[in-house]
Amino acid sequence: MSMVYINIFLAFILSLMGMLVYRSHLMSSLLCLEGMMLSLFVMMSVTILNNHLTLASMMPIVLLVFAACEAALGLSLLVMVSNTYGTDHVQNLNLLQC
């Protein structure tokens, strides 16, 4: 395993650990989730380029589309929670039920 793969895997693990540690605030969770998606995108792109997989060359773009949708939904949820309760604590998400 080359150093590039190890560094990207380490970035993913650090983002995952950040997700576990900073799970009380929604903004911190969204930033850690974006770090995870970025490391997955880079890992997928490097793997496809190194292995010359032409059939899977669209997969990083599909991952970016899903990451953009996730970011838009997460930010809209963050705005809704912060406007309603004045804070971005994740525990307030349970109170948004109808």
UniProtKB/Swiss-Prot annotation:
Enumerate the Gene3D superfamilies for this protein. Answer: 1.10.287.3510
- Any keyword Secreted? no
Pfam families (UniProt xref): Oxidored_q2
Q: Which GO terms describe its cellular component?
A: mitochondrial inner membrane; respiratory chain complex I
**GO MF:** NADH dehydrogenase (ubiquinone) activity
Protein name (database record): NADH-ubiquinone oxidoreductase chain 4L
- Give the top-rank taxon of the lineage listed in the UniProt record for this protein: Eukaryota
Entry keyword annotation includes Oxidoreductase: no
Question: What is this protein's function per UniProt?
Answer: Core subunit of the mitochondrial membrane respiratory chain NADH dehydrogenase (Complex I) which catalyzes electron transfer from NADH through the respiratory chain, using ubiquinone as an electron acceptor. Part of the enzyme membrane arm which is embedded in the lipid bilayer and involved in proton translocation.
Give me the reactions it catalyses: a ubiquinone + NADH + 5 H(+)(in) = a ubiquinol + NAD(+) + 4 H(+)(out)
Q: For this UniProt record, give its keywords in alphabetical order, as a comma-separated list.
A: Electron transport, Membrane, Mitochondrion, Mitochondrion inner membrane, NAD, Respiratory chain, Translocase, Transmembrane, Transmembrane helix, Transport, Ubiquinone
Gene from which this protein is expressed? MT-ND4L
> What lineage does the source organism belong to?
Eukaryota, Metazoa, Chordata, Craniata, Vertebrata
Per the UniProt record, which residue ranges are transmembrane?
1-21, 29-49, 61-81
Q: Which organism is it from?
A: Vulpes vulpes (Red fox)
